[in-house]
Amino acid sequence: MAGQSRPDLIRIGQVTAPHGVRGAVRVYPTTDFPERFVTLKRVMIDGPDRAVGARFRGFVKNLVILELEGITDRNQAERLRGADLLVPREEVHPLPEGYYYDFDIIGIEVVDPDGRQLGRVVEVDHTSPVHDLYVVETAPGKRYLVPAVRRFVKEIDLETGRMVIDPIPGLLED
């Protein structure tokens, strides 16, 4: 996905297994807003060519139970195991100012305060217990981790596709 334009379809979940014998499926939510499934009416399965009606049935542990239009038995539901559930980009929940979806950040240009290009964000790393890290790849292919905090990230402009960072000495060195 790095370097590509932002996706038109956003993954909100992945089918993990059938639920019961009448075609319902268990879905692992890949969204920060699993409550979105409560009001979900339509979803695309693995791409824009297969849009179906969706009906929320409940939560079980960390999974969502959905009924999908046209899926009426366990065998049909089993064939969906591993399928991505997608929604149009316009249907994602708006975030508060200063918060961004990974798909908005990945691919944007990273510059220093003087406008000198430093690279592009190729990944957002969520493994730090303190804050996210932006993985910035330079033209020669080196990667650097930039903490996603105001001390380093001075500006993110999604319209221009630019992130301004103020790196401390040594942050971008070998």
Swiss-Prot record:
InterPro entries: PRC_barrel-like_sf (IPR011033), PRC_RimM (IPR056792), RimM (IPR011961), RimM_N (IPR002676), RimM_N_sf (IPR036976), Transl_B-barrel_sf (IPR009000)
Record protein name field: Ribosome maturation factor RimM
Domain comment, as recorded: The PRC barrel domain binds ribosomal protein uS19.
Main location: cytoplasm
Family: Belongs to the RimM family.
Purpose of the protein: An accessory protein needed during the final step in the assembly of 30S ribosomal subunit, possibly for assembly of the head region. Essential for efficient processing of 16S rRNA. May be needed both before and after RbfA during the maturation of 16S rRNA. It has affinity for free ribosomal 30S subunits but not for 70S ribosomes.
Subunit architecture: Binds ribosomal protein uS19.
One Pfam family linked to the record: PRC_RimM
Domain of life of the native organism: Bacteria
Cellular component, GO annotation: cytoplasm; ribosome
An example Gene Ontology molecular-function term: ribosome binding
Domain PRC barrel: 97-171
UniProt keyword annotation of Transferase present: no
Location relative to the cell: Cytoplasm
Key words, A-Z: Chaperone, Cytoplasm, Ribosome biogenesis, rRNA processing
Biological process terms in GO annotation: ribosomal small subunit biogenesis; rRNA processing
